[in-house]
C-alpha cells in the first residue's frame, strides 16, 4: 500500500497539473485546421498494418466507410479481414497481391499485380463514399519500383481534401515521408520469432 500524500505534496501536484493542463489547452485551441491526412506506417517493427486496421475500426465506429487494398499479401488468410467484413458494405476489401516477392520470384508478375492493385486503389480514392483508404504494403511495391513513385505521390497529394489515406510497409520512400502529414516508424526492439516462436492465429494473422 502506498504512503499517504501530505497536504503540501498534494498542493504541489495540483499546481503542476493545473499548469500542464493550461499548456495542453492552449496547444489544442491553437489547432484549427481540419483536413484529410496522409499517414505512413513504416519501420522494421511489428504492427504497421495492425495499427492501420485499428484506425479503420475507429472510423467504422464513427459510421464512416473504409476501403482496403492489399498490395502484397495474397492467399494469406487474415482474421482482421474477417472481422472488418462483418461491417458489411461499410468495408470494401481488395487483396490484390500474390504474396511476398521471395515467394513469387517473378518480377513481371509482381509488377502486374501491383499495377492492378494501384488501379483499384485509384478507384477507391476517387469514390466520395469512402472516408479512409488503407494501402497495405504499398511501400514494398514502391521500394521494388513496381510502381512509379511520382505518379503515386501525385494521386495521393491531389486527392479530395477530406479523404484520409494510410500507407503501410517497410522502407517508405523519403519523398512519401515528406508528403505525409503523419509518419510513424515501428522500431523492432524484440521479436518472439527470433526465439523460435512461430506465427500464431490472432497474433500474426
Where do the model's predicted regions map?
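Residue-level preference for short coil/turn positions at secondary-structure junctions
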Residues: 34-35, 62, 129, 161
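Generic detector of well-ordered alpha-helical packing
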Residues: 71, 137-138
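Conserved P-loop
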Residues: 39-126
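Extreme N-terminal, non-catalytic leader segments
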Residues: 1-38
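Glycine-rich phosphate-binding loops of nucleotide-dependent enzymes
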Residues: 134
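Short gly/ser/thr-rich secondary-structure transition/capping motifs
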Residues: 21-24, 115-119, 165-168
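Short glycine- and Lys/Arg-enriched binding-loop motifs that mark or flank ligand-binding interfaces
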Residues: 32, 41-43, 59, 165, ...
Amino acid at each position: 500500500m502506498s504512503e499517504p500524500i501530505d497536504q503540501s505534496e498534494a498542493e504541489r501536484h495540483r499546481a503542476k497539473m493545473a499548469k500542464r493542463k493550461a499548456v495542453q489547452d492552449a496547444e489544442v485551441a491553437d489547432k484549427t485546421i481540419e483536413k484529410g491526412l496522409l499517414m505512413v506506417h513504416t519501420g522494421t517493427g511489428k504492427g504497421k498494418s495492425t495499427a492501420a486496421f485499428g484506425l479503420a475500426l475507429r472510423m467504422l465506429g464513427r459510421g464512416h466507410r473504409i476501403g482496403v487494398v492489399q498490395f502484397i499479401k495474397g492467399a494469406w488468410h487474415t482474421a482482421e479481414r474477417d472481422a472488418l467484413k462483418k461491417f458489411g458494405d461499410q468495408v470494401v476489401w481488395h487483396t490484390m497481391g500474390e504474396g511476398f516477392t521471395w515467394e513469387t520470384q517473378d518480377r513481371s508478375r509482381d509488377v502486374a499485380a501491383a499495377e492492378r492493385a494501384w488501379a483499384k486503389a485509384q478507384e477507391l480514392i476517387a469514390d466520395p463514399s469512402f472516408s479512409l483508404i488503407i494501402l497495405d504494403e504499398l511501400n514494398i511495391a514502391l521500394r521494388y519500383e513496381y510502381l512509379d513513385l511520382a505518379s503515386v505521390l501525385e494521386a495521393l497529394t491531389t486527392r479530395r481534401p477530406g479523404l484520409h489515406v494510410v500507407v503501410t510497409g517497410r522502407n517508405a520512400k523519403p519523398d512519401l515521408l515528406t508528403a505525409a502529414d503523419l509518419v510513424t516508424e515501428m522500431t523492432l526492439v524484440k521479436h518472439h520469432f527470433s526465439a523460435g516462436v512461430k506465427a500464431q492465429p490472432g497474433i500474426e494473422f
